[in-house]
Amino acid sequence: MTIRIAINGFGRIGRSVVRALYESGKTDLFTLVSINELAPASGIAHLLKYDSTHGRFPFSVSEKENQLIINGDEIALTHIGNLNSLPWQQQNIDIVLDCTGKYGNKADGLSHINRGAKKVLFSHPGSQDIDATIIYGINHQTLTSSDRVVSNGSCTTNCIVPVIKVIDEAFGVESGSITTIHSSMHDQQVIDAYHKDLRLSRAASQSIIPVDTKLAAGIERILPKFKGRFEAIAVRVPTINVTAMDLSLTVNNDVCICDINQAIQAATSNHDLYGVLSYTEEPLVSVDFNHDPHSCIVDGNQTRVSHKRLIKMLVWCDNEWGFANRMLDTAMAMHQAEN
C-alpha cells in the first residue's frame, strides 16, 4: 500500500517535491492525493509544467475543476487559507508535507493532525516544541511512531551536517565556521524596494548581499556535542539556484588533504549516506550542480589544510532539488517508523 501524501503550499519546494516524486519514479511508493495552494489552478499547472530553474516537467500536466492531473493521476486541488479547514480526514492523508514556509511549531502541526492527517513534515526549521528535526542520513533512524510533527531542517543544514559528522568521526572536530554562499530567494527584490531588512531591500541581481542565518543553531540541534563551537554567516549571490558552503574546521588530529578527501569518498558508500553525500574532483561550477539530488557534494579540488589541523572545504548543493528529494526520504522514514 502506498503512502498517501498531501502538500500544503505549492511554491518552490512544493513544486520541487512533486517533480522529484515523479522524476524519481517514487509514485509506486507515494500517492499524491491533494495539493492545497491559494494560487489559481491555471498558475499552479503552468508553473509546474514550466520552470526557469529546472526546465520543463517531463510529464503531462493539466487542470480541471478542483483537480490537477499529472501523468493521468487526478490530484485534488484546494485553495484553503485556514489550517483548521483542511480536508485531510476525508482524503485519508497519511503525511502532510507542509511547504508553505509559514508554519513550523507544534500547534501548527497539530492543526493538520486535528484535521485528519496522521503526521506532518515541515519543509523548514521548526520550533523547539516539535517532535523531531530530521537530517536524512544522520538521524532519520531515531524516528519513532510517536514523532508526528517533524521538520526536515533547512537546505544548508542538510548540506553541511553530513560533512561535519564524517570529518568528526574520522579525525575529531574541535570547532568550525561556515560561510553560506546562497542563491537568490523569493524574499529579495528585483529592483530596490522597501524591506524591513535594509540589505534585502536592494536589487538581488546587482549585489552580493549579507543575510542573517541560524545555521549554527541548526547544527547544534542535530549534533548537540558542538553547542557553542560553530559560527556561521551567509551571503546571497545573483544566481537563481545552487548553494556553496565554505567550511572551516579545526580537528584534533594531524591530517593532510588526501586524508580528508579519502574520508569523504569512503563515506559516500555508507548505507545511511548513500545518495545523500557525493564527491567530485571535476572542475565544476555552480550551474553544474543544478538538479543534483544529493544533499551535499564535496569539491575535492578545493580541500585545503593549514598547519595540519585547520581544514577548509567547499561543499555544493542544489538548495531546491536536493532538499526536495530529502523531503521524500524523510516522509518514507516517518512512515516506516510507524510500521
Swiss-Prot record:
Binding of NAD(+), residues: 12-13, 319
Disulfide bonds: none
Enzyme Commission number(s) from the entry: 1.2.1.72
A single GO BP: pyridoxine biosynthetic process
Position of the signal peptide: none
Location in the cell: Cytoplasm
Annotated protein name in UniProt: D-erythrose-4-phosphate dehydrogenase
Gene: epd
Keywords, in A-Z order: Cytoplasm, NAD, Oxidoreductase, Pyridoxine biosynthesis
Chief location category: cytoplasm
Coiled-coil regions, chain positions: none
Pathway entry: Cofactor biosynthesis; pyridoxine 5'-phosphate biosynthesis; pyridoxine 5'-phosphate from D-erythrose 4-phosphate: step 1/5
Function: Catalyzes the NAD-dependent conversion of D-erythrose 4-phosphate to 4-phosphoerythronate.
SMART domains reported in the protein's UniProt record: Gp_dh_N
Family: Belongs to the glyceraldehyde-3-phosphate dehydrogenase family. Epd subfamily.
GO CC annotation, single: cytoplasm
Site (Activates thiol group during catalysis): 182
Reactions that this protein is recorded to catalyse: D-erythrose 4-phosphate + NAD(+) + H2O = 4-phospho-D-erythronate + NADH + 2 H(+)
GO molecular-function terms, A-Z: erythrose-4-phosphate dehydrogenase activity; NAD binding
Active site residues of this protein: 155
Domain of life: Bacteria
Subunit structure: Homotetramer.
Chain residues that bind substrate: 154-156, 213-214, 236
NCBIfam families on file: E4PD_g-proteo, PRK13535.1
Organism: Colwellia psychrerythraea (strain 34H / ATCC BAA-681) (Vibrio psychroerythus)
